[in-house]
Amino acid sequence: MSVVVGSGFSAAPSAAAGAADAAHDAHLALGGAPCDVALVFVGGDLVTEPAEALRVVQEILDPTELVGTTAGGLIAGEQEHEQGDGVAVWAISLGDEGRAEVFELHTTEIEDGIALSGIPAVELGATSAVILLADTAHLPLEATLNAFAEHLPGVPVIGGVPSLVPPDGRPLLRGLGQSTAAGLGIRFEGIEVLPLVSQGARPIGPELTVTAGEGAVIRELAGRPAIDVLRDTVDSLNEDDREQIRHGLLLGLVVNPGQPDYGPGDFIVRGLAGADPESGAVVVGAPVTVGQVARLHVRDPQTATTDLDDELALRRTATGSARVAGALAFTCNGRGSDMFGHANHDAEAIQAGLGPLPLVGMISAGEIGPVGGRPFAHGFTATLAVFLA
C-alpha cells in the first residue's frame, strides 16, 4: 500500500462543527486507509476552542498521532483564508513502509543561556523529512535549526511559526489538548518528501565577497567598506532594478561555497537590519563569515510569482513517474493579497504546478525550510513539503 493523503476545510461557526466537516472530507479521501498522522489547523476566533476541534478529529479519523496549531490564516485546496475563522485538517496514511514519530522540543534556562532538548537521536539517513511547528515565544528558532543541522544533517525541515496565538499563549496542539512544548515536530521515514522553498527574490548586481565581518555585521565587501560597495552597486544598476530596490534592500548570502555558479536557490536572503555610516559596516539578519559570497536581491510580486512557478516546475520534474500524494504549505502573512493584490496566489500556483492534490497549511509568522541543505527561518517565503505516493 502506498502513501495516501486526505484533506478538508470548513468555515463552520464552531470549532467542533468545522472539525467535523473537515475531518469527514479527509476521511473520505483516505479511502479506508488508516490515518497515521492528522494535522489540525484552527484559525481566527476559533483559536479559543482547539480542544473541541481535536476531540472531533480524533473521533472521526482515529489517528495514531494527532498534532496541530492555531493560526491567523489557513490554506486549503486552492484557497488561502487570510482572516476568516475555520478548521483545516490534513491526514496521511503512510503505507506499508512509512513511519512517523512525533516529538516535542523543550527549553530550559541555564546559567549561560537556554538548553534545548527533544531532537530525535536516530541513525543518519533514516529520516525523510521533519515537519516543525515552532512557538517562538518559547523557542529560540535560529539556535534550534542549527541544532537540527548538527544532529540531523541534510534532513529537510519544513514548517512555520503560528501567526495567531490564543489568549493563554499556547498555540501548539497535541492529542486532545494544548501542548506546553516550545516546538512540535513530526519525523517521517520510509517515504519520499520533496521540500520547496520560494524566497520570492532574485539576485541583481555582481557577486561580492565578505572580506571583513563577524556575527551579523559585514564590515568590508571586496576589501572596501561594505556600505560604500553597496551604494556603488546600487548606482550601477539599471533603472528597473533601482526602482525595485525601493521596496527594500535585500542581501543574499551563499550557504554552500565553492560552486562554479550561484543561482537563486543558493542564497539565504535577508534584509539589511542597519548600517553605520561612520565605519561603513552593515548589519544583516544572519551570521556571516569572511570569504562568504554575497549578492544584492530584490523582491516584488512578479519576481515572487516567477520564483514560485520555477520551484514548482523543478519539483514536478523531480517527481518523475511518481504520483504526488499531497502537500503541506507554510506561507508568510506578508504574502497573499498584501503582496500580490489578490488572495489565493500561492495555493493556486501550487495546485497548477503539482495538482490537483490534497493541500493544507497555514499562513505563518515565519517559515522554515532548507537552503543549500540546511534549515533556515524565512520571511515573505512560501515553503512546501511535497509527499510522494
Label the predicted regions.
Residues 1-51, 56-59, 63-65, 69-340, ...:
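Small-residue-enriched flexible segments
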